[in-house]
């Protein structure tokens, strides 16, 4: 698969496995610092309120950022690791994860596509090619992230998500 195809594959599976369904609030290509020379984009951002029936439930919500990395050049590019939310994940093929596992910042998690019938550890040791026919993929957390402090206000991030649309 080519880089563009891998990015589309990872994005589509992230949306269907992690971002879709009732009570999911997310946007793609969320721009931060819009209108400045330092504009940054987060591939996907999700808002996870503790509930939606009261102001306090909404205000206790957290944000999750997902940055899609399709290959080593993409990972090393220096672009797209804009982690400003409480939870931050890199989304990448298992092959790439194997190569960069030692370089990943301690608080950042990793999500990889894993065939539904395979164990994460087995997939790590012997990754399945993404273009393998007949495979049902699931996006799995292979490295949990640590919850940290948000670097932007809730209002700002919600506005940026709203401006991005889906």
Model-derived features with residue positions:
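Catalytic cores of nucleic-acid endonucleases
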Residues: 58-115
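Active-site beta-strand-loop-beta-strand hairpin of nuclease catalytic cores
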Residues: 37-65
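Non-catalytic C-terminal interaction segments of nucleic acid-processing enzymes
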Residues: 1-30, 34-38, 101-166
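Short, flexible loop/turn elements at secondary-structure junctions
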Residues: 30-32, 48, 69-72
